[in-house]
Amino acid sequence: MPRSRINGNFIDKTFSIVANILLRIIPTTSGEKRAFTYYRDGMLAQSEGNYAEALQNYYEATRLEIDPYDRSYILYNIGLIHTSNGEHTKALEYYFRALERNPFLPQAFNNMAVICHYRGEQAILQGDSEIAEAWFDQAAEYWKQAIALTPGNYIEAQNWLKITKRFEFE
């Protein structure tokens, strides 16, 4: 049974209904419809914290989805799950792959920056300030890219960049 038929959350049900209507009225191939169904089911599973099920659906969606823009969001969501699971190297890989297909994903740049910043903090705890600075510099570069795409967002990152003198804003 498709996940959309077993979900009890009102918002998820509403999303599923709208998605099903769109699948019927928008001219798409059967492969694109199947890819979207897997993507939708992956999002529903992810929203419930069922990450293994979400990953299965996302992997199947990436196998079927041919549009680079749509694939970017699938890859981004896979990155989110790996981030949540503490698998930062895998998460970075999927964020990179998403950005290769869609360079206008500020949230991917932000998440990559957060991972790099975390790694910088871990390096400080291990007493390696040189490695920490390299991670912080990389985080700054990713945050600058996210901020360039959405200047009004990522205020905490903007403040960190100012405080650490890694970026000057007008």
Curated annotation (Swiss-Prot):
It is a peripheral membrane protein. Transmembrane segments: none annotated. GO terms for cellular component: chloroplast thylakoid membrane; plastid. TPR repeats lie at residues 35-68, 72-105, 120-153. It is found in: Plastid, Chloroplast thylakoid membrane. The keyword Plastid applies. Keywords: Chloroplast, Membrane, Photosynthesis, Plastid, Repeat, Thylakoid, TPR repeat. One of its GO terms (biological process) is photosynthesis. Its main location: plastid. It comes from the Eukaryota. InterPro entries: PSI_Ycf3_assembly (IPR022818), TPR-like_helical_dom_sf (IPR011990), TPR_rpt (IPR019734), Ycf3/AcsC/BcsC/TPR_MFPF (IPR051685). SUPFAM superfamilies: TPR-like. Essential for the assembly of the photosystem I (PSI) complex. May act as a chaperone-like factor to guide the assembly of the PSI subunits. Belongs to the Ycf3 family. This is Photosystem I assembly protein Ycf3. It comes from Oryza nivara.
